[in-house]
Amino acid sequence: MQARTQTPIALHRLQMMALMAIITAFGLQLLRVLLPSLVWYLKETQQAATTTLGGLAALTAIAGLLAIPLWRFLGQRTSLWTVGAAVLVARLLEQLSRDPALDTWLSLLGTAAFTVFLPLWLGHVRAAPSLEGGPRWAGGLLLGLTLDSALKGLANSLDLSWIGGWLPLLPLALLAGWSLWLLRSETYAAGMPASDARLVNVLPLLGLGPYLVLQAIVFQNSGWVAATAGVDGRIGIWLVMAGNLAALAGMVGGFSKPGTFRPGLGLIAGLYLTLSATQLQVPGPGFIAILLAAQFVCGWVWATISLTAAQTERGGLGRTSALLSLAMFLFIGLAFFYYAALDLRLPFDRSIVFPAAGLVFGLAALWASRQGERVPRSPQVDWSPIHAGLFLSLLPAIWLSVQAFSSPARTLQRTPERVLSYNIHSAYDITGRQDPEAIAQVIESSGADIVGLQEISRGWLINGSTDLVHWLSQRLGMRVVFQGTSDPVWGNAILSRLPIQQWGMAPLPRGDALLGRGYLWAEFADAYGGELLFITTHLHQTDDGAELRRQQATGLVEFWGERQPAILVGDLNAEPPEPAIGVLLEAGLADAWSAAGQGDGLTYPAGTPDRRIDWILLTPDLAAVVTEVIGTTASDHRPLLVRFEHSP
């Protein structure tokens, strides 16, 4: 029996995984620019058809087939250099760009190049000894996810793409330069080495697409993790990194004992991944256990899949390219259906997307387990991926801890005087570019004590996966409460400079609408010994939805129950003649604009507003002194600010 050894931090082994890790991180960053650009730039500002958006997204998946002719006609070295450099250059240029149109096309080209790189890299590592090919593929993939989340964590969940200046460009340039050095240092086989595998060995690669769906929407999404687990956004980032460490531990275990992942265990893993995916929207601390266990299982599965897929049979990359392209097509399709179900009436509920992704990845695990028994065991246990993951995890953990102690929330010990209502459009401005700093500056300059936010995302993939709740709270030094209305990460929030006594939320009547609505409330102590009730809401949006808005307004009145003092703010999607407004005014709430506003009070669309749909309503014991529409295009709505006082 061959003795097995344990290797400590092996820099040469990490170097063998580093190129795949960096390209993966850059590819995911480009993908998170592409999907929002399709929605917010091409669709919202350029009125592109949905079919056009779907076609462009599908092209990035189909692009993987280009690996076949590139490998054949350019050879191993030139094809890897060309495609790898394309990803790096596209990412760096996108970082420099401030133009949404240029962002769109750079991210499109960069994402397509990333899809081409995947089969090229797998073909390349197959030319190495079989015991190195698998770890280089899986280790690079999982470390890439870890690196990507570490960079986001350092920026409080905001992608570096949306941060201007030289500071975010510096680490990206260093990583790109290191990648070029790694490409130069690679050993390239002469001629046309065996680079493709049998169909039974590459079939499990189909699991990559569904796996990335679960990672991008849930497991690498600190906002989703925080909202579902019921923890602070900072803890959400830590939990994401802990999940990545669990995945790396599972991968190392899988590589050290590949023969243990037999079909029976593969079946159990597949069932667990499928069943756990049904619980990803269920709030509670149990989500943390699901996150860590699922990530560990995913890491073990990837060890088995990569060892199986790294086996070689013949030259070319036909099977590998086709399977990985199909995998990325599955990713695009599942992600599209998850978000399209909020806008299009589909024959199934969007909640099936996660179980479907878990099922496909689980089947990939089961299939790979049938082949894993034939894979030889490595004579060494390589712990270096865990060490690297731990180092990457400590970076945001330490930085966020320093932030927490150096920048505590600033608290006012007085009665609130200014309130703001702002539909922030997920921080996308009228040009289709995400700029949360512009939103923060609007709120900051308003001097508002309490802010009711609508259309705030904690990490929708089509919104750039930014946890705006956590980011704005940290940036402004304000307390925050949030509750999703359609899933855990999209809904309403309240920012406050005052202590929040208690808070809660409830859904509003939905009818047959696709997008769920609700209201969020908080209570604050005032100088008169009472409690100020503050409510923020966002009502149904369609032009033919007046009756549903009336029902939703009735629900708000029932909750309010004539308590005083109280303030109701929000995007009501209704102008003065509508029944919903009548319900609120007849119940005894007073329109702050009618009392103290100058002009017509139009708030939407922000560029050239022609509708008054954003409201602040006060109870009779409060009087609006000044009501102002703030002229800004940081969102597609203009915010509404009211300075008020207690009536004598």
Language model regions located:
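Active-site beta-strand/loop signature of hydrolases that rely on acidic residues for catalysis
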Residues: 26-65, 239-244, 417-424, 435-465, ...
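N-terminal post-signal-peptidase region of extra-cytosolic proteins
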Residues: 431-437, 465, 598-606
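A generic structural micro-feature
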Residues: 414, 513-516, 607-609, 634
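N-terminal signal-anchor transmembrane helix
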Residues: 375-378, 388-441, 445
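Metal-dependent phosphoester-hydrolase catalytic domains
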Residues: 3-10, 29-45, 57-60, 69-70, ...
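Pair of pore-lining "gating" transmembrane helices in MFS-fold secondary transporters
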Residues: 14-27
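Structured beta-strand-rich core segments of catalytic domains in phosphoester-bond hydrolases
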Residues: 402-411, 424, 431, 450, ...
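Surface-exposed cleft-lining segments at the edges of enzyme active sites
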Residues: 229-235, 426-428, 508-510, 538-545
